[in-house]
């Protein structure tokens, strides 16, 4: 079936033609030729894009209200984006995750990388949290929901609270649109049990992206005292305890998140070795330092200090500050794990900020490893923004 009569054709400006290779997932507003017909295209509509030489670049979701005007759906210029097409993309995404994980707790769809631009789906057993973060995703959320239900999902939470939606000019809101979700969901990960509040928690309730970094930190923490700063629901700390850490102190400014961490510790059978501190992270680290309290391992996994390029320098200074205060708490030959989820901060800039902070504290340092998000968060080879997560493992020698 041809889509010739279905989708309007949009052209790129001549000066932009050679700047992109076929398969690049985004085209920006200033790359698009806006003629009378283009100006009438509504947010979320599907278009075909050609370069100035009439080269066919594929089928795209279009939004004239966003800086990212076009998001790739299919490189096949004749693709028809219907329920069958959506179902096919979901199955491809599911097949990858089934090969990776025994338990059904993971990022099921990671936006453009899974050919569903702006769609984020986190799976919690028979429950999913759907984030339609683009105009096309929002316009087609019912079709996406129908397709999800065909894969054994009973409950669907529609989470429309992301920063990305605001950039797309979309409304906010959160509701259960299928089934029932009345309490935090038990999540099994890295031999620990966590509890995710998918209705009131941060983002979708838990951070699946850190799973493999949790695992490495846990291996290094056996028999050790661990300080887990910006702990949220106990991410690094609980993984460490079930792997043999001696004691974990979890610091977070959110009392509800820490209460879920305590519940996870109880369910994991490690509550006697788990202590929470409801405090500002910097205040807590300063207090530990003033009390001469030191740890074999310190982990800091803060929120995004630099969500956009405009906040890059401010964010880098904040990461340097985290590195300074946390490195002062690490015993000689101990470990420091520093993380960033800021899209605007690449690995090199983040590493340099961390090293500046550590050396300001007078510490001699080795980098023993670094990592990103797990394989349920794949990265588009042409879009480095999807490699947002950076976790660097340091050993402090003195």
What are the functions of these language-model segments?
Residues 233-246:
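Conserved SAM-binding loop of SAM-dependent methyltransferases across substrates and taxa
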Residues 1-123:
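Non-catalytic accessory regions of SAM-dependent methyltransferases
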Residues 109-122, 138-206, 215:
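Non-catalytic substrate-recognition/targeting regions of SAM-dependent transferases
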Residues 256-296:
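S-adenosyl-L-methionine
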Residues 335-398:
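C-terminal catalytic and target-recognition region of SAM-dependent MTase-like enzymes
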Residues 247-252:
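Conserved SAM-binding motif I beta-strand of class I
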Residues 295-325:
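Mobile active-site "lid"/loop adjacent to the S-adenosyl-L-methionine
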